[in-house]
């Protein structure tokens, strides 16, 4: 019944408790969603979320699709909540370029997420929230080391660079292995062999060694990496809802265990390098970093001091940059080839015309193979197997498209949306490499720059350059000599499963045929 003061009167303690609870929830929602906004700016729009969990249910099993749909309603800059944490989501090519490139200093941070502290003991350059001068100097050091032992020329090599030498050896191994599997079984799953070959390339660059494909030590790395991607696929609400860290969570426990094992493995290999290190005889990236570390210790004025642990974490980051993304790219490429035999034939016709069958493809052939490049770009775009960049954060108060974004805000960058934007691509769901070619058959560089897979700006993937080159060379060598298909009557499932990278279902029904003319093993 009404009270004498015009407010509702409560007839029981239960009603009173319910009213107080409702008021508190309402106050909490207003509190967590309200931010002071400078005059002339607006808060990013977005849907209302549920108390305590925010938009966790809205994201669902395919966050890239859910957030793309929301961007169609709310625009290129929108805001959601995960738990009580506000997250700004960026879509649209121009908006993302504005944020990560033109305003790159504002958006170069990483959010201080709990799961990030578990990777490389919280010292990873890739995942660490630090974005200051020391981080920038270490990143340049890592980039230079990677360049020196991958794409820089070396007159002592028969190949143009270390990367070409390592990829050529592994591609030749795969050709022999696939032939053997066809003779013995008649079909196979290429992923289980690709992943080991790609791991061998980055092992050679980082550690100066190649493993046999049945080596248990190498297989342990491969298995850890596969498990890492599977475990991270479920995401970590504990990053945004702290109480979940203290509740039983099998995925979180597995994530912790995998990171400890991977870090221990890296530490073991690097300790071995310290033990066998000889100044003036630099074998690989790890030796290069050890030399830098020792030289800087003698120079008190050096601006980049490296501890032994920092050497481990840099190698950790470089290994990660050159492994999962490349394996996934080649694997998706093979899936598109067997489902589009016309495209496979066109690539092989181009290889025959430009290179022939008397020698092996080289990195220097890349500019003369525009259709193969167009195919790779379309694979990157259509699969968008890295749907989001690693989350960014703002390091200062800033604005974007008229919307105010405070310092320390977590920022998601939806690469999948850009690669499937109908305004950019017209028919984004069609797999059509020709879209990247001009009327004269050359590569359309302007359009190719609109594909986003490796991020942009100050935090873009450190392994982008070698990744693109490695995918190109593996495919060129394999397709020059072999034709890929699947067993008659079998279908491939290209439905992507969400994770750290989008993965297709494994297919055990691949077949290869050596191409009808030309030697099987060509001169490099």
Swiss-Prot record:
Molecular function via GO: arachidonate monooxygenase activity; catalytic activity; demethylase activity; enzyme binding; estrogen 16-alpha-hydroxylase activity; estrogen 2-hydroxylase activity; flavonoid 3'-monooxygenase activity; heme binding
One term under GO cellular component: intracellular membrane-bounded organelle
Residues glycosylated per entry: 71
InterPro entries in the record: Cyt_P450, Cyt_P450_CS, Cyt_P450_E_grp-I, Cyt_P450_E_grp-I_CYP1, Cyt_P450_sf
Keywords assigned: Cytoplasm, Endoplasmic reticulum, Glycoprotein, Heme, Iron, Lipid biosynthesis, Lipid metabolism, Lyase, Membrane, Metal-binding, Microsome, Mitochondrion, Mitochondrion inner membrane, Monooxygenase, Oxidoreductase, Steroid biosynthesis
Catalysis: reaction(s): an organic molecule + reduced [NADPH--hemoprotein reductase] + O2 = an alcohol + oxidized [NADPH--hemoprotein reductase] + H2O + H(+); estrone + reduced [NADPH--hemoprotein reductase] + O2 = 2-hydroxyestrone + oxidized [NADPH--hemoprotein reductase] + H2O + H(+); estrone + reduced [NADPH--hemoprotein reductase] + O2 = 4-hydroxyestrone + oxidized [NADPH--hemoprotein reductase] + H2O + H(+); estrone + reduced [NADPH--hemoprotein reductase] + O2 = 6alpha-hydroxyestrone + oxidized [NADPH--hemoprotein reductase] + H2O + H(+)
Pathway participation: Steroid hormone biosynthesis; Lipid metabolism; fatty acid metabolism; Cofactor metabolism; retinol metabolism
This enzyme's EC code(s): 1.14.14.1, 4.2.1.152
Membrane-traversing stretches: none
Record keyword Lipid biosynthesis present: yes
Gene3D superfamilies associated with the record: Cytochrome P450 (1.10.630.10)
Signal peptide (UniProt feature, chain positions): none
A single GO BP: response to 3-methylcholanthrene
Tissue specificity note: Liver.
Similarity section: Belongs to the cytochrome P450 family.
Domain-related comment: Contains a chimeric signal that facilitates targeting of the protein to both the endoplasmic reticulum and mitochondria. A 12 amino acid sequence between 33 and 44 functions as a putative mitochondrial-targeting signal. The removal of the first 4- or 32-amino acid residues from the intact protein positions the mitochondrial targeting signal for efficient binding to the mitochondrial import receptors. The membrane-free P4501A1 seems to be more sensitive to proteolysis.
Entry protein name: Cytochrome P450 1A1
Gene: Cyp1a1
